[in-house]
Regions:
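Strongly charged
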Residues: 1-24, 28, 35-150
């Protein structure tokens, strides 16, 4: 009986989040920012910071997105279901973009604020998700074309 092999080690969501947070290949800096953000969340009165992070990512992750499909001369905005890996990617991207857009604070504080806000279903990352869902709802008439979109 042979062992199943894999080319890459599976990563936890925490490691993926740190990789998305990383800039200029400085993973140690990203880990420190993430750890400081968890401490800030703990200071804010939340018992388990990792639960807050998971719930914030879940609240900010989209279920449906819009993809463009050209048929003839017309371009249709087709709503398609988002795969779990892409959901995580978009949620972390939107949370980090919202945190980076803020100014005059250390990144760990900005990240902690954004995670707490996404945990409570408010602020920028959740608004991006709601906007994506609104666009999908508006273009629901073209949902039958989803099987033609890659």
């Amino acid at each position: 009986m042979s062992k199943p092999t894999s080319s890459a080690m599976p990563q936890s969501n925490e490691e993926k989040f740190i990789n998305h947070l990383m800039k200029n290949w400085k993973k140690s800096v990203a880990r420190k920012i993430y750890a400081d953000a968890l401490k800030e969340i703990k200071k804010a009165g939340h018992m388990n910071p990792s639960v807050v992070v998971q719930a914030a990512i879940e609240n900010a992750s989209p279920n449906v997105m819009i993809k463009s499909k050209r048929i003839g001369w017309a371009v249709y905005q087709v709503p398609v279901e988002v795969k779990p890996a892409k959901r995580f990617f978009f949620a972390t991207k939107w949370i980090l973009d919202a945190a980076r857009a803020k100014t005059w604070k250390p990144m760990s504080e900005k990240l902690a604020e954004e995670l707490i806000a996404a945990y409570g279903n408010q602020w920028a990352a959740v608004k991006k998700k709601e906007e994506a869902h609104r666009m999908a709802e508006a273009n629901k008439a073209f949902a039958y074309m989803a099987k033609y979109v890659n």
